[in-house]
Amino acid sequence: MTDRIYLTSDGYNRLKEELYVLVHQTRREVLEKIAEARAHGDLSENAEYDAAREEQSHTEARIADLENKLASATILDPKQIKTDKVYILTSVKLKNLDTPDEIIEYTLVSSEEADTDSGKISVRSPVGRALIGKAVGEKVQIVVPKGELHYEILEIFVK
């Protein structure tokens, strides 16, 4: 049984688009590569054939993964997200207690939508796990691979 995953409608649509491209474009291209490599003769020492079969395996695995994720996805409406505590899809403004001038902001999302470059962190990350369920004013200590982080939650909101 697959765990439920929570996505924004944008995140759901991105996964759906990726699946569409894999099924209707990539899969066909890989099959063409396999057919072309097969035409070269002896398959026992055909690196081109082996590479195409490997690509097919990766493509089919990703298709299966996306189908499972989309089937178990719950699309969250940002308008219905509470801001009394940190939940998935909330944004959090944090004060770094080790460097008081540093204020950072994260939005907690599913692993499938995480993108640290745009401030979207997974609820399953060390920071995400430490923040879930916390309220404004609470201090959190987060153990990460580089050591410990200490933050105070200044604001919880939905973008």
Curated annotation (Swiss-Prot):
Q: What is the primary gene name for this protein?
A: greA
- Listed HAMAP family: GreA_GreB (MF_00105)
GO molecular function terms listed in the Swiss-Prot or TrEMBL record: DNA binding; RNA polymerase binding
**Pfam family of the protein (one):** GreA_GreB_N
Q: Does the keyword Coiled coil apply?
A: yes
Q: What is this protein called?
A: Transcription elongation factor GreA
Question: Could you tell me which PROSITE patterns the record lists for this protein?
Answer: GREAB_1 (PS00829), GREAB_2 (PS00830)
Q: Which GO terms describe its biological process?
A: DNA-templated transcription elongation; regulation of DNA-templated transcription elongation
Recorded hits in PANTHER family, A to Z, give: TRANSCRIPTION ELONGATION FACTOR GREA (PTHR30437:SF4)
Q: Which family does it belong to?
A: Belongs to the GreA/GreB family.
Q: What does this protein do?
A: Necessary for efficient RNA polymerase transcription elongation past template-encoded arresting sites. The arresting sites in DNA have the property of trapping a certain fraction of elongating RNA polymerases that pass through, resulting in locked ternary complexes. Cleavage of the nascent transcript by cleavage factors such as GreA or GreB allows the resumption of elongation from the new 3'terminus. GreA releases sequences of 2 to 3 nucleotides.
Q: Which InterPro entries match?
A: GreA/GreB_C_sf, TF_GreA/GreB_CS, Tscrpt_elong_fac_GreA, Tscrpt_elong_fac_GreA/B, Tscrpt_elong_fac_GreA/B_C, Tscrpt_elong_fac_GreA/B_fam, Tscrpt_elong_fac_GreA/B_N, Tscrpt_elong_fac_GreA/B_N_sf
Q: Which residues fall in a coiled-coil region? A: 45-75
